[in-house]
Amino acid sequence: MKKFITLSVLPILASSSIRLLGKMMNVGTVGGEKVDMFTRNQKPIIIAFWHGRQVMMPLAYRGTAASILISQHRDGEIIATIMKKFGFCAIRGSSSRGGIPALRKLVSAGRQGQDLVITPDGPRGPARQIQMGVLSLAKLTGFPIVPLTFASSKKKVFSSWDRFQIPLPWAKGLFVWGDPIWVTSTQKKDDLLQQGVF
């Protein structure tokens, strides 16, 4: 019964709450035209956002099909089910568990024309520090990385490793899309940090 509630009832409540929260907030978007250009030309991208900002991200997606990398940990199963409620394909794996098979599945999904979604600092951090997964994915696919973030005027910030944030109703929110980042075969994660793109 507990597993049924966790994997069936909770994702429905969570996805409905996210949609309702989006309607209760005054949400704007900056830089969306950068993503729309790729969508119009049917060119897949890699969408990257920090782990602690993921709550509202399903509402930001502007494409037609996307696969998202989610860890194989217990909470990852819940998140995967929630993401499916928004139409995302969940691919399970992380740098610490199931990473290589997950990377192959992401590359395969990209070759089928899907956008790819990843948290560069997930699933365990350190917070807001890029791990090698997103760079490897960009090098293997040739897709640009498009940074995405969300800011809210009022929010609850938890004391978790990622400083997880949940926006509050009636707050002002803003999705911000960054410029596409094309990764070369020799590029390192420190290069991206020095450029200030994350």
Predicted regions and their residues:
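Membrane-anchoring hydrophobic helices of lipid-metabolizing enzymes
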Residues: 1-56, 62-63, 170-172, 194-197
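Membrane-interfacial amphipathic helices and adjacent loop/beta segments
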Residues: 8-30, 70-111
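Catalytic core of membrane glycerolipid acyltransferases/transacylases, capturing the structured
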Residues: 44-97, 141, 157
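Short gly/pro/ser/thr-enriched loop/turn and capping motifs at secondary-structure boundaries
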Residues: 75-77, 99, 124-127, 152-156
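Generic beta-sheet signal
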Residues: 93, 119, 147-148
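Catalytic-site beta-strand/loop segments enriched in glycine and acidic/polar residues
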Residues: 105-137, 141
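A cross-family acyltransferase "interaction/gating" segment
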Residues: 129-189
